[in-house]
């Protein structure tokens, strides 16, 4: 379980995260929703150690990681797919994937890209020698997720993976995330603006507003709880 307790963060005097507190249960998919600018991306960066926290704590499976460097969090089983994908455009698809294996023992990384990555994302096998920058936005998103999975995480954190992506690939990504949870027991924290995508996938939901968690519950109750109205622009 991922546990976030009383997390606070400031930017240039502005209070961005305000006593953020929630859990992400093991082997389930939790969606974090909220309008633009409420602090969702900042929260994810704090979880991964990209941005330091001012106060509060972060624990993953009982181990406190609040002050741990990013590489230690990856080594503990966390992986992050950032907003905007951030692939390496001049490297091949295969090279991008292998970078994701950097935290694995060298003997494991030398084995190359596991078949299960290509099974989840067949297009990456077909294009493994093409440069990452030549892929479409949807293909790059699949590459970014595949790269994160190369570290063999137990917790996968994604920041708006449907942004700017065609509907057919959105469906593919949704099916893949559901498989990771249902078949592999992976824990997923998904920040998402596309409400219907979140509704379809969520086991649990959390809603952020003005830097704080203002609602939470089971995914099956999102409509009854009025979550659509809470996050409508």
Predicted regions located by residue number:
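Helix-to-loop junction immediately C-terminal to a conserved catalytic motif
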Residues: 48
């Amino acid at each position: 379980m991922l546990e976030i307790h009383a997390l606070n963060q400031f930017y240039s005097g502005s209070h961005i995260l305000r006593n953020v507190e929630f859990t992400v249960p093991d082997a389930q998919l939790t969606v974090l929703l909220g309008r633009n600018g409420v602090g969702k991306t900042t929260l994810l960066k704090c979880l991964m150690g990209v941005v330091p926290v001012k106060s509060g704590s972060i624990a993953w499976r009982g181990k406190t990681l609040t002050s741990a460097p990013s590489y230690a969090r990856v080594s503990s089983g966390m992986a992050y797919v950032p907003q905007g994908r951030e692939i390496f455009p001049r490297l091949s698809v295969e090279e991008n994937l292998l970078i994701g294996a950097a935290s694995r023992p060298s003997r494991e990384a030398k084995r190359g890209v596991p078949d299960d990555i290509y099974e989840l994302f067949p297009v990456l096998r077909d294009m493994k020698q093409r440069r990452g920058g030549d892929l479409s936005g949807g293909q790059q998103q699949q590459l970014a997720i595949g790269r994160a999975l190369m570290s063999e995480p137990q917790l996968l954190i994604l920041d708006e993976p449907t942004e700017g992506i065609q509907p057919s690939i959105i469906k593919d990504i949704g099916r893949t995330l559901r498989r990771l949870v249902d078949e592999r027991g992976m824990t997923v924290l998904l920040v998402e603006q596309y409400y219907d995508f979140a509704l379809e996938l969520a086991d649990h939901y959390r809603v952020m507003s003005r830097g704080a968690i203002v609602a939470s519950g089971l995914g099956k109750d999102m409509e009854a709880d009025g979550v659509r109205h809470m996050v409508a622009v």
